[in-house]
Protein backbone atom coordinates (compact mmCIF):
# COMPACT_ATOMS: atom_id res chain seq x y z
CA UNK A 1 0.00 0.00 0.00
CA UNK A 2 1.46 3.35 -1.00
CA UNK A 3 2.17 6.03 1.55
CA UNK A 4 -0.01 8.40 -0.47
CA UNK A 5 -3.05 6.49 0.80
CA UNK A 6 -2.32 7.40 4.41
CA UNK A 7 -3.36 11.02 4.78
CA UNK A 8 -1.96 11.41 8.29
CA UNK A 9 1.47 10.07 7.34
CA UNK A 10 1.44 12.17 4.19
CA UNK A 11 0.67 15.27 6.24
CA UNK A 12 3.58 14.55 8.57
CA UNK A 13 5.88 14.01 5.62
CA UNK A 14 4.71 17.25 4.05
CA UNK A 15 5.45 19.13 7.26
CA UNK A 16 8.94 17.68 7.44
CA UNK A 17 9.67 18.49 3.81
CA UNK A 18 8.49 22.05 4.26
CA UNK A 19 11.29 22.66 6.76
CA UNK A 20 13.99 21.14 4.58
CA UNK A 21 16.04 23.39 2.34
CA UNK A 22 16.39 20.68 -0.31
CA UNK A 23 12.71 19.76 -0.21
CA UNK A 24 11.31 17.75 -3.10
CA UNK A 25 7.69 17.40 -4.18
CA UNK A 26 5.70 15.12 -1.88
CA UNK A 27 4.69 12.71 -4.63
CA UNK A 28 8.34 12.31 -5.63
CA UNK A 29 9.41 11.67 -2.03
CA UNK A 30 6.87 8.94 -1.35
CA UNK A 31 6.43 7.22 -4.70
CA UNK A 32 8.75 4.30 -3.81
CA UNK A 33 7.63 3.92 -0.18
CA UNK A 34 5.32 1.08 0.84
CA UNK A 35 3.47 0.92 4.14
CA UNK A 36 2.16 -2.17 5.91
CA UNK A 37 1.25 -3.19 9.43
CA UNK A 38 -1.53 -4.24 11.75
CA UNK A 39 -3.60 -3.26 14.77
CA UNK A 40 -4.47 -6.01 17.26
CA UNK A 41 -6.74 -6.11 20.30
CA UNK A 42 -6.59 -9.03 22.75
CA UNK A 43 -8.50 -9.96 25.87
CA UNK A 44 -7.12 -12.82 27.98
CA UNK A 45 -8.67 -14.29 31.12
CA UNK A 46 -6.84 -16.89 33.24
CA UNK A 47 -7.73 -19.13 36.14
CA UNK A 48 -5.11 -21.42 37.69
CA UNK A 49 -4.33 -23.45 40.79
CA UNK A 50 -1.55 -21.77 42.78
CA UNK A 51 0.09 -22.45 46.14
CA UNK A 52 -0.61 -19.54 48.50
CA UNK A 53 0.76 -19.92 52.05
CA UNK A 54 1.12 -23.67 51.45
CA UNK A 55 -2.52 -23.91 50.41
CA UNK A 56 -3.91 -24.59 46.94
CA UNK A 57 -6.11 -21.74 45.77
CA UNK A 58 -7.75 -20.68 42.54
CA UNK A 59 -6.14 -17.51 41.24
CA UNK A 60 -7.78 -15.59 38.40
CA UNK A 61 -6.58 -12.71 36.27
CA UNK A 62 -7.70 -10.85 33.15
CA UNK A 63 -6.01 -8.26 31.00
CA UNK A 64 -6.33 -6.34 27.76
CA UNK A 65 -3.49 -6.22 25.28
CA UNK A 66 -3.27 -3.63 22.52
CA UNK A 67 -0.57 -3.78 19.86
CA UNK A 68 -0.08 -1.70 16.74
CA UNK A 69 2.71 -1.97 14.17
CA UNK A 70 3.45 0.14 11.11
CA UNK A 71 6.34 -0.59 8.71
CA UNK A 72 7.81 1.64 6.01
CA UNK A 73 9.88 0.18 3.17
CA UNK A 74 11.65 2.62 0.86
CA UNK A 75 13.33 1.71 -2.41
CA UNK A 76 16.59 3.65 -2.66
CA UNK A 77 17.62 2.33 -6.08
CA UNK A 78 17.62 -0.99 -7.94
CA UNK A 79 19.77 -2.58 -5.23
CA UNK A 80 19.42 -0.71 -1.94
CA UNK A 81 16.32 -0.46 0.23
CA UNK A 82 15.58 0.74 3.75
CA UNK A 83 13.01 -0.47 6.27
CA UNK A 84 11.77 1.24 9.43
CA UNK A 85 9.04 0.02 11.75
CA UNK A 86 7.40 1.54 14.80
CA UNK A 87 5.43 -0.39 17.38
CA UNK A 88 3.08 0.36 20.24
CA UNK A 89 2.25 -2.29 22.79
CA UNK A 90 0.39 -2.60 26.07
CA UNK A 91 0.92 -6.04 27.58
CA UNK A 92 -0.19 -5.58 31.16
CA UNK A 93 3.29 -5.60 32.73
CA UNK A 94 5.45 -8.36 34.18
CA UNK A 95 5.72 -11.87 32.84
CA UNK A 96 6.11 -14.59 35.46
CA UNK A 97 8.19 -17.66 34.84
CA UNK A 98 7.91 -20.74 37.03
CA UNK A 99 6.99 -24.38 37.21
CA UNK A 100 3.70 -24.81 35.39
CA UNK A 101 2.37 -27.47 33.04
CA UNK A 102 5.73 -29.21 32.86
CA UNK A 103 7.86 -26.11 32.53
CA UNK A 104 11.12 -25.96 34.40
CA UNK A 105 12.64 -22.96 36.10
CA UNK A 106 16.24 -21.72 36.05
CA UNK A 107 16.06 -20.60 39.68
CA UNK A 108 12.71 -18.79 39.46
CA UNK A 109 11.90 -15.11 39.39
CA UNK A 110 9.92 -12.47 37.59
CA UNK A 111 11.34 -10.47 34.72
CA UNK A 112 9.46 -7.34 33.71
CA UNK A 113 10.37 -7.27 30.04
CA UNK A 114 8.44 -4.15 29.19
CA UNK A 115 6.47 -1.34 30.76
CA UNK A 116 2.69 -1.36 30.66
CA UNK A 117 2.80 0.99 27.68
CA UNK A 118 5.67 0.96 25.23
CA UNK A 119 6.31 2.81 21.99
CA UNK A 120 9.51 1.97 20.14
CA UNK A 121 11.22 1.66 16.79
CA UNK A 122 11.46 -2.11 16.70
CA UNK A 123 12.76 -2.42 13.15
CA UNK A 124 15.34 -0.28 11.32
CA UNK A 125 17.69 -1.76 8.74
CA UNK A 126 19.29 -1.25 5.35
CA UNK A 127 19.18 -3.97 2.72
CA UNK A 128 21.08 -4.68 -0.47
CA UNK A 129 19.93 -7.09 -3.17
CA UNK A 130 22.03 -8.30 -6.08
CA UNK A 131 20.85 -11.22 -8.17
CA UNK A 132 19.41 -13.83 -5.83
CA UNK A 133 21.30 -12.60 -2.76
CA UNK A 134 19.99 -10.18 -0.13
CA UNK A 135 21.98 -8.78 2.80
CA UNK A 136 20.32 -6.82 5.62
CA UNK A 137 22.08 -4.82 8.35
CA UNK A 138 20.40 -3.32 11.40
CA UNK A 139 17.44 -3.99 13.69
CA UNK A 140 15.38 -6.80 12.16
CA UNK A 141 13.54 -10.06 12.70
CA UNK A 142 15.71 -12.92 13.99
CA UNK A 143 14.94 -15.35 11.19
CA UNK A 144 15.63 -18.85 12.50
CA UNK A 145 13.96 -22.16 13.31
CA UNK A 146 14.34 -21.53 17.05
CA UNK A 147 12.61 -18.13 17.25
CA UNK A 148 9.13 -16.87 16.49
CA UNK A 149 8.78 -13.09 16.28
CA UNK A 150 11.69 -11.62 18.25
CA UNK A 151 14.07 -8.96 16.91
CA UNK A 152 17.76 -8.23 17.16
CA UNK A 153 20.53 -5.94 15.87
CA UNK A 154 22.90 -7.52 13.41
CA UNK A 155 23.46 -8.98 9.96
CA UNK A 156 21.25 -11.34 7.96
CA UNK A 157 22.03 -12.80 4.51
CA UNK A 158 19.83 -14.86 2.19
CA UNK A 159 20.69 -16.60 -1.10
CA UNK A 160 18.51 -18.55 -3.53
CA UNK A 161 20.86 -19.16 -6.49
CA UNK A 162 20.09 -22.89 -6.42
CA UNK A 163 16.58 -23.59 -7.65
CA UNK A 164 14.35 -24.79 -4.84
CA UNK A 165 16.97 -24.11 -2.15
CA UNK A 166 17.31 -21.06 0.10
CA UNK A 167 20.40 -20.57 2.27
CA UNK A 168 20.53 -18.17 5.19
CA UNK A 169 23.03 -16.92 7.76
CA UNK A 170 22.72 -14.48 10.65
CA UNK A 171 24.68 -12.76 13.38
CA UNK A 172 22.93 -10.77 16.10
CA UNK A 173 24.68 -8.99 18.98
CA UNK A 174 21.73 -7.18 20.59
CA UNK A 175 18.64 -9.33 21.10
CA UNK A 176 15.19 -8.11 22.03
CA UNK A 177 14.09 -8.76 25.62
CA UNK A 178 11.16 -10.81 24.34
CA UNK A 179 8.67 -12.07 26.93
CA UNK A 180 8.54 -15.49 25.22
CA UNK A 181 12.19 -16.22 26.07
CA UNK A 182 11.46 -18.25 29.19
CA UNK A 183 15.16 -18.59 30.09
CA UNK A 184 15.65 -14.80 30.18
CA UNK A 185 15.20 -14.41 33.94
CA UNK A 186 16.89 -12.63 36.80
CA UNK A 187 18.49 -15.77 38.27
CA UNK A 188 20.74 -16.23 35.23
CA UNK A 189 21.91 -12.61 35.32
CA UNK A 190 22.72 -12.93 39.03
CA UNK A 191 24.69 -16.15 38.46
CA UNK A 192 26.55 -15.22 35.26
CA UNK A 193 26.46 -11.41 35.10
CA UNK A 194 24.47 -11.48 31.85
CA UNK A 195 21.00 -12.24 30.63
CA UNK A 196 20.81 -14.80 27.84
CA UNK A 197 19.83 -11.98 25.46
CA UNK A 198 23.14 -10.22 26.19
CA UNK A 199 25.05 -12.95 24.31
CA UNK A 200 25.76 -12.93 20.55
CA UNK A 201 23.62 -15.22 18.40
CA UNK A 202 24.96 -16.93 15.25
CA UNK A 203 22.95 -19.10 12.90
CA UNK A 204 22.89 -20.86 9.53
CA UNK A 205 20.05 -22.60 7.77
CA UNK A 206 18.91 -24.28 4.57
CA UNK A 207 15.31 -24.48 3.35
CA UNK A 208 14.47 -26.68 0.39
CA UNK A 209 11.30 -27.32 -1.57
CA UNK A 210 11.16 -29.93 -4.33
CA UNK A 211 7.52 -30.81 -4.82
CA UNK A 212 6.17 -32.79 -3.04
CA UNK A 213 9.13 -32.92 -0.61
CA UNK A 214 10.37 -30.07 1.57
CA UNK A 215 13.06 -29.84 4.24
CA UNK A 216 14.81 -27.51 6.69
CA UNK A 217 18.23 -27.79 8.33
CA UNK A 218 19.24 -25.29 11.03
CA UNK A 219 22.00 -24.64 13.54
CA UNK A 220 22.18 -21.68 15.93
CA UNK A 221 24.74 -20.86 18.61
CA UNK A 222 24.11 -18.47 21.48
CA UNK A 223 27.66 -17.61 22.48
CA UNK A 224 28.76 -19.21 25.78
CA UNK A 225 25.22 -20.49 26.40
CA UNK A 226 23.86 -23.15 24.04
CA UNK A 227 24.01 -24.64 20.56
CA UNK A 228 20.68 -25.56 18.93
CA UNK A 229 20.17 -27.95 15.99
CA UNK A 230 17.00 -28.89 14.10
CA UNK A 231 16.12 -30.82 10.95
CA UNK A 232 12.70 -31.16 9.37
CA UNK A 233 11.51 -33.35 6.50
CA UNK A 234 8.02 -33.06 5.07
CA UNK A 235 5.87 -34.05 2.12
CA UNK A 236 2.53 -32.81 0.81
CA UNK A 237 0.36 -34.56 -1.76
CA UNK A 238 -2.66 -33.32 -3.70
CA UNK A 239 -4.89 -36.38 -4.00
CA UNK A 240 -7.41 -34.40 -6.04
CA UNK A 241 -8.81 -30.87 -6.14
CA UNK A 242 -10.54 -31.32 -2.77
CA UNK A 243 -8.15 -33.57 -0.85
CA UNK A 244 -4.58 -32.93 0.31
CA UNK A 245 -2.49 -34.90 2.81
CA UNK A 246 0.78 -34.04 4.51
CA UNK A 247 3.48 -35.69 6.60
CA UNK A 248 6.18 -33.98 8.66
CA UNK A 249 8.96 -35.21 10.93
CA UNK A 250 11.40 -33.21 13.08
CA UNK A 251 14.48 -33.85 15.20
CA UNK A 252 16.44 -31.39 17.30
CA UNK A 253 18.87 -31.12 20.16
CA UNK A 254 20.31 -28.52 22.53
CA UNK A 255 23.95 -28.68 23.64
CA UNK A 256 24.76 -26.31 26.52
CA UNK A 257 28.15 -24.74 27.15
CA UNK A 258 29.77 -26.69 30.00
CA UNK A 259 30.55 -23.67 32.18
CA UNK A 260 27.05 -22.27 31.73
CA UNK A 261 25.43 -25.65 32.45
CA UNK A 262 27.47 -26.16 35.62
CA UNK A 263 26.70 -22.66 36.89
CA UNK A 264 22.97 -22.66 36.19
CA UNK A 265 22.19 -26.36 36.60
CA UNK A 266 20.80 -27.09 33.14
CA UNK A 267 21.39 -30.05 30.84
CA UNK A 268 21.34 -30.94 27.16
CA UNK A 269 18.11 -32.06 25.51
CA UNK A 270 16.65 -33.97 22.58
CA UNK A 271 13.44 -33.40 20.62
CA UNK A 272 11.64 -35.52 18.06
CA UNK A 273 8.14 -35.32 16.68
CA UNK A 274 5.95 -36.14 13.71
CA UNK A 275 2.63 -34.92 12.36
CA UNK A 276 0.16 -36.17 9.74
CA UNK A 277 -2.44 -33.77 8.36
CA UNK A 278 -5.28 -33.81 5.86
CA UNK A 279 -7.64 -31.31 4.26
CA UNK A 280 -10.83 -32.73 2.80
CA UNK A 281 -13.01 -30.09 1.20
CA UNK A 282 -14.13 -27.93 4.14
CA UNK A 283 -12.65 -30.20 6.83
CA UNK A 284 -9.12 -30.20 8.23
CA UNK A 285 -7.49 -32.57 10.72
CA UNK A 286 -4.10 -33.57 12.09
CA UNK A 287 -2.53 -36.05 14.49
CA UNK A 288 0.97 -36.32 15.86
CA UNK A 289 3.43 -36.95 18.66
CA UNK A 290 6.20 -34.91 20.29
CA UNK A 291 8.89 -35.94 22.79
CA UNK A 292 11.26 -33.40 24.34
CA UNK A 293 13.42 -34.31 27.29
CA UNK A 294 16.45 -33.17 29.26
CA UNK A 295 19.33 -35.65 29.31
CA UNK A 296 19.17 -35.67 33.11
CA UNK A 297 15.61 -36.35 34.28
CA UNK A 298 16.07 -34.01 37.24
CA UNK A 299 17.35 -31.08 35.17
CA UNK A 300 15.69 -28.39 33.11
CA UNK A 301 16.44 -27.64 29.47
CA UNK A 302 15.03 -26.14 26.28
CA UNK A 303 14.65 -26.94 22.59
CA UNK A 304 13.51 -23.54 21.29
CA UNK A 305 15.03 -20.18 22.21
CA UNK A 306 11.92 -18.00 21.87
CA UNK A 307 8.35 -19.28 22.05
CA UNK A 308 7.92 -22.53 20.08
CA UNK A 309 9.94 -21.49 17.05
CA UNK A 310 9.02 -23.74 14.10
CA UNK A 311 8.67 -26.94 16.11
CA UNK A 312 5.51 -29.04 15.79
CA UNK A 313 2.96 -27.94 18.35
CA UNK A 314 -0.71 -28.47 19.19
CA UNK A 315 -2.85 -26.90 21.85
CA UNK A 316 -2.10 -23.50 23.35
CA UNK A 317 -0.61 -23.74 26.85
CA UNK A 318 0.49 -27.26 27.80
CA UNK A 319 3.34 -27.88 25.36
CA UNK A 320 6.28 -25.51 25.82
CA UNK A 321 9.71 -25.94 24.23
CA UNK A 322 11.30 -22.75 25.60
CA UNK A 323 11.79 -24.13 29.13
CA UNK A 324 10.91 -27.53 30.61
CA UNK A 325 11.92 -30.11 33.20
CA UNK A 326 12.75 -33.81 32.84
CA UNK A 327 10.85 -35.91 30.32
CA UNK A 328 7.92 -34.64 28.29
CA UNK A 329 5.96 -36.59 25.69
CA UNK A 330 2.54 -35.83 24.20
CA UNK A 331 0.32 -37.03 21.40
CA UNK A 332 -2.31 -34.79 19.89
CA UNK A 333 -5.23 -34.61 17.48
CA UNK A 334 -6.88 -31.56 15.94
CA UNK A 335 -9.99 -31.15 13.79
CA UNK A 336 -11.90 -28.27 12.28
CA UNK A 337 -14.55 -27.34 9.76
CA UNK A 338 -14.80 -24.15 7.72
CA UNK A 339 -18.41 -23.24 7.02
CA UNK A 340 -18.72 -22.40 3.30
CA UNK A 341 -19.27 -18.77 2.31
CA UNK A 342 -19.14 -17.49 5.90
CA UNK A 343 -15.45 -17.17 6.79
CA UNK A 344 -16.16 -19.09 10.01
CA UNK A 345 -14.00 -22.00 11.20
CA UNK A 346 -14.89 -24.11 14.24
CA UNK A 347 -12.22 -26.42 15.61
CA UNK A 348 -10.83 -28.31 18.58
CA UNK A 349 -7.48 -29.68 19.80
CA UNK A 350 -6.80 -32.50 22.25
CA UNK A 351 -3.34 -33.05 23.76
CA UNK A 352 -2.47 -35.87 26.17
CA UNK A 353 0.80 -37.06 27.73
CA UNK A 354 3.16 -36.74 30.68
CA UNK A 355 5.88 -34.49 32.08
CA UNK A 356 8.37 -34.17 34.94
CA UNK A 357 11.05 -36.49 36.29
CA UNK A 358 10.64 -39.82 34.46
CA UNK A 359 7.34 -38.49 33.11
CA UNK A 360 5.80 -38.81 36.58
CA UNK A 361 2.76 -36.58 35.97
CA UNK A 362 -0.01 -37.11 33.45
CA UNK A 363 -1.52 -34.04 31.80
CA UNK A 364 -4.03 -33.21 29.09
CA UNK A 365 -5.33 -30.10 27.35
CA UNK A 366 -8.57 -29.46 25.49
CA UNK A 367 -8.88 -26.40 23.25
CA UNK A 368 -12.05 -25.13 21.58
CA UNK A 369 -11.68 -22.57 18.77
CA UNK A 370 -13.83 -20.26 16.67
CA UNK A 371 -12.24 -18.10 13.96
CA UNK A 372 -14.01 -15.57 11.77
CA UNK A 373 -12.41 -14.08 8.67
CA UNK A 374 -14.49 -11.01 7.90
CA UNK A 375 -12.35 -10.13 4.88
CA UNK A 376 -8.71 -10.20 3.83
CA UNK A 377 -7.82 -7.47 6.33
CA UNK A 378 -10.03 -8.09 9.39
CA UNK A 379 -9.93 -11.34 11.40
CA UNK A 380 -11.36 -12.48 14.72
CA UNK A 381 -10.11 -15.40 16.84
CA UNK A 382 -11.49 -16.92 20.03
CA UNK A 383 -10.28 -19.96 21.96
CA UNK A 384 -10.66 -21.60 25.34
CA UNK A 385 -8.03 -23.92 26.83
CA UNK A 386 -8.45 -26.25 29.81
CA UNK A 387 -5.47 -28.15 31.28
CA UNK A 388 -5.92 -31.08 33.65
CA UNK A 389 -2.85 -32.39 35.52
CA UNK A 390 -2.26 -35.25 37.93
CA UNK A 391 -0.32 -32.85 40.12
CA UNK A 392 -3.58 -31.00 40.76
CA UNK A 393 -2.44 -27.78 39.08
CA UNK A 394 -5.33 -27.27 36.67
CA UNK A 395 -5.40 -24.19 34.46
CA UNK A 396 -7.79 -22.61 32.00
CA UNK A 397 -7.42 -19.64 29.71
CA UNK A 398 -9.83 -17.74 27.45
CA UNK A 399 -8.69 -15.43 24.68
CA UNK A 400 -10.42 -13.15 22.20
CA UNK A 401 -8.48 -11.39 19.45
CA UNK A 402 -9.40 -8.91 16.74
CA UNK A 403 -6.73 -8.04 14.18
CA UNK A 404 -6.78 -5.57 11.29
CA UNK A 405 -3.91 -5.86 8.80
CA UNK A 406 -3.04 -3.46 6.00
Task: Locate each region found by the language model.
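Beta-barrel outer-membrane channel/assembly domains of diderm bacteria
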Residues: 2-139, 155-160, 211, 233-241, ...
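Solvent-exposed loop segments that connect transmembrane elements
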Residues: 49-58, 98-112, 174-196, 254-265, ...
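Structural signature of outer-membrane beta-barrel domains
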Residues: 42-46, 89-93, 142-144, 172-177, ...
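Solvent-exposed loop/turn segments connecting transmembrane beta-strands
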Residues: 118, 142-154, 173-178, 196-200, ...
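Internal metal/ion-chelating core segments
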Residues: 159, 165-235
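Glycine/serine-rich loop-strand microenvironments at binding/catalytic pocket rims
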Residues: 23-38, 42-50, 56-58, 204-219, ...
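Detector for outer-membrane/organellar transmembrane beta-barrel domains
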Residues: 209-212, 234-356
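Outer-membrane beta-barrel proteins
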Residues: 57-60, 140-150, 222, 252-254, ...
Amino acid sequence: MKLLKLSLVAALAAGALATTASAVPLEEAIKDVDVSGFMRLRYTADEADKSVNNEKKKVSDAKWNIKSVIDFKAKVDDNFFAVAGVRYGNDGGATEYGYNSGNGNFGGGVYNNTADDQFDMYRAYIGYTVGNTTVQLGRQNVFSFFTDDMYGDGLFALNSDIQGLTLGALWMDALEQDGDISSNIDAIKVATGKRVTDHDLYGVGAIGSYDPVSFQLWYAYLNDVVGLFAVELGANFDVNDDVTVGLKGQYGFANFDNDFADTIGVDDSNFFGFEASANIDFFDMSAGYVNYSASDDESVSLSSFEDSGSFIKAGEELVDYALYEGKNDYWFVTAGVTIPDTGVRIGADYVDGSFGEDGDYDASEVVARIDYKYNEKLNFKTWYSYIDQDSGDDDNRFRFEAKYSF
